[in-house]
Amino acid sequence: MKNDLLANRHIGISKKDEEQMLRKIGVSSLDELIDKTIPANIRLKEPLALPEAMTEYEFGQHIAALAAKNKLYTTYIGMGWYNTVTPAVIQRNVFENPVWYTSYTPYQTEVSQGRLEALLNFQTAVCDLTGMPLANCSLLDEATAAAEAVTMMYALRPRDMQKSGANVVFVDESVFPQTLAVVTTRAIPQGIQIRTGKYGETELTPDTFACIVQYPNAGGNIEDYRAFVEKAHAAGCKVAVAADILSLALLTPPGEWGADIVFGTTQRLGTPMFYGGPSAGYFATR
């Protein structure tokens, strides 16, 4: 079979090709092949009950009528995923504007000024809301940002901790479960141990080099972590805070009470859930 023509590559085999293939496997037709390979008891005996053909417009109306039968309920999923209000100007000029994700490569500065400006605005907003001096241009989501925080804090252990082999991260039990799952998965191959518990009751042992807390936590509680952060720093531990970035418009930014890393998801800032994505994670540090 020749593949040098687009029609051959994309339309499929010719009748002659089909006959050669059938002869090779010892059958005379596709019907005989199906009879020999698909059990009769699972095959449909009667023709498909299809309605009359519709135009594209009629089909659109039909599907809309079917969709209108769905019952819409308020989503209480939480845990880092929330319904949002997306400003119309953002929806039209960003989400529905393919220029943002189709034109050129983002690494050519001379043709990506708009994208570079958007990234600078993103980083500036993250720094302003978290109270931190540095922010990157986003990560995949909150859970992977947490894993990056652990890797970073592990690499930044003081020399005495490195010599003693300190390899424990304390994760508060009110951290989102998906965050804990991803952090645990990423920690295992690095030889990092994960310990969970209540932040206000845990004792930070000498082998603990970092802590992670949620703000507000998975139960929606707004905890005052100041004393815990001071305790962790006194023990030589760094503290990463998983923060709801929208709440930071009202709450005291973690950077103002001593957090070393602040991370989370920016889905809260107006990105629709899109059946589970996309959601850019943010990451800020000092």
Walk through the language-model features, giving the residues of each.
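Short loop-beta-helix segment that forms the pyridoxal 5′-phosphate
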Residues: 107-111, 115, 128-148
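Residue-level preference for well-ordered alpha-helical positions
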Residues: 22-23, 34-35, 127, 187, ...
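Generic structural marker for isolated residues within well-ordered, non-membrane alpha-helices
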Residues: 18-19, 31, 123
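Conserved PLP-enzyme active-site core in the AAT-like
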Residues: 114, 144-286
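N-terminal glycine-rich anion-binding loops that anchor highly charged ligand groups
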Residues: 27-38, 42
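N-terminal entrance/gating region of PLP-dependent enzymes' catalytic architecture
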Residues: 38-121, 127
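Gly-rich Lys/Arg/Thr-decorated short loops/hinges at beta-loop-alpha junctions or inter-strand turns
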Residues: 97-109, 127-132, 163-166, 194, ...
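Charged, compositionally biased N-terminal leader segments and the immediate start
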Residues: 1-13, 17-21
